Amino acid sequence: MGAITGVDGVDVVIGTSSFLREFSHGKDMAYITKTAIEVIEFVKTKGIEVRFSSEDSFRSDLVDLLSIYQTVDKIGVNRVGVADTVGCANPRQVYDLVRTLRGVVSCDIEVHLHNDTGMGKASKTLLVRLFTLLGQLLPTHTQR
């Protein structure tokens, strides 16, 4: 819908953790990947920016997560987003995931953190300090 209403960009978001796959939408990673490709390719035909984000990134299987990010990067998303949907990731986990992701995608990386446990602000501070030299890391957004 956003692609036909004149927006500048669209965020394609789907839950990738086993929790969300089982209790939210009931889809497996093959279905998620196939659907993401179809939606991203459609959005790209509209000439607008497209970001792919996984919901609940930090409780998702790392192999699954990196695989889908690599796939959407290859088809040309402008950026990928990782989300600490429930505010459970500590700064080291955020650093490790973003650093690993930087090694498998060439697009921009965006980080979305929640501060439920107080880790969002700490993670944001760490990311700003550690990734200043790496480039292509977009500013983080912390929600309470």
Regions found by a protein language model. Give the residues of each.
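Alpha/beta enzyme core
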Residues: 1-109, 124-132
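Active-site capping/gating regions of soluble enzymes
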Residues: 73, 112-114, 118, 122-144
